[in-house]
Swiss-Prot record:
Gene source species: Akkermansia muciniphila (strain ATCC BAA-835 / DSM 22959 / JCM 33894 / BCRC 81048 / CCUG 64013 / CIP 107961 / Muc)
Catalytic activity reported: 5-amino-1-(5-phospho-D-ribosyl)imidazole-4-carboxylate + L-aspartate + ATP = (2S)-2-[5-amino-1-(5-phospho-beta-D-ribosyl)imidazole-4-carboxamido]succinate + ADP + phosphate + 2 H(+)
Gene that produces this protein: purC
Alphabetic keyword roster: ATP-binding, Ligase, Nucleotide-binding, Purine biosynthesis
EC code(s) of this entry: 6.3.2.6
Record Gene3D superfamilies: ATP-grasp fold, B domain (3.30.470.20), Phosphorylase Kinase, domain 1 (3.30.200.20)
GO terms for MF: ATP binding; phosphoribosylaminoimidazolesuccinocarboxamide synthase activity
Keyword Nucleotide-binding part of the UniProt annotation: yes
Single biological process term from Gene Ontology: cobalamin biosynthetic process
Stated name of the protein: Phosphoribosylaminoimidazole-succinocarboxamide synthase
Pathway(s) of this molecule: Purine metabolism; IMP biosynthesis via de novo pathway; 5-amino-1-(5-phospho-D-ribosyl)imidazole-4-carboxamide from 5-amino-1-(5-phospho-D-ribosyl)imidazole-4-carboxylate: step 1/2
Pfam families reported for this sequence: SAICAR_synt
PROSITE patterns in the record: SAICAR_SYNTHETASE_1 (PS01057), SAICAR_SYNTHETASE_2 (PS01058)
């Protein structure tokens, strides 16, 4: 295996199959586009395990992902994709950047989920864009933007119910998609779904169970991740 990419939270390696990559989850934590950094023991293991449970569940509901196989505590094999330069964000309750941008009190539920795009470019601060921007930046076609939003809404509906069953409120989340290397006409869910990419609040207490514990210096970051993993594995 040869390393071919390293991001903030994961590394990618080649495998014997040119259309399959090995994805390794790191213990690194970042916030503010990398301005704040730390390492947490077992973070990679927990995020990998949480993503695996969620992706398998989504696959069972008909959502196509890049998942191929579980490998070990911190590695999975995934289909090789060309990641679209878009983060697709779904918001059910006001929090984070939405509350800051729009002056809406954190915890305010939305009448309907809000779906947003952000353009993946750290040097620009990952700006929020609309479908027209995405088209002009060659990030996605109009048809692909419609597909991405529809897929995001489907994922949201499934995840809301899934997390509710384990006592968690899905506040918001971001996901990424990629074109399959072996068939670029197919776009699948890629990257990860974990407390790094979701806001999850305990239904009974309202306690934050996600990366906001790191962003906001709330402490007990890994204890929260471990609790999320435990609930999901007991449910699965």
């Amino acid at each position: 295996m040869e390393p071919i990419y390293e991001g903030k939270a994961k590394r990618l390696y080649t495998t014997d199959n040119p259309n399959v990559l090995r994805m390794e989850y790191k213990d690194d934590a970042t916030a503010g586009n990398g301005a704040k950094k730390a390492q947490f023991e077992n973070k990679g293991r927990m995020n990998k395990a949480i993503t695996l449970v969620i992706y398998r569940m989504l696959e069972s509901k008909g959502v196509k992902t890049h998942l191929v196989a579980d490998v070990d505590d911190i590695n999975i094999d995934v289909k090789k994709v060309s990641i679209l330069p878009l983060e697709v964000i779904v918001r059910n309750i006001a929090a984070g950047s939405f509350s800051r941008r729009m002056g809406v009190k954190e915890g305010t539920p939305f009448k309907k989920p809000i779906v947003e795009f952000s353009y993946k470019d750290d040097s620009l601060g990952d700006p929020f864009i609309n479908d027209d921007y995405a088209r002009e930046m060659n990030a996605a076609t109009e048809e692909e933007c419609v597909f991405l939003k529809n897929q995001a809404r489907i994922v949201n509906d499934v995840l809301i119910d899934f997390f509710k069953q384990v006592g968690l409120t899905l506040v918001d989340f971001k996901i990424e998609f990629g074109r399959l290397a072996e068939d670029p006409s197919q776009i699948v869910l890629a990257d990860e779904i974990s407390p790094d990419t979701c806001r999850l609040w305990d239904i009974k207490t309202g306690e934050k169970m996600d990366k906001d514990r790191f962003r906001q210096d709330l402490g007990n970051v890994m204890e929260a991740y471990e609790e999320v993993l435990s609930r999901l594995q007991n449910k699965a």
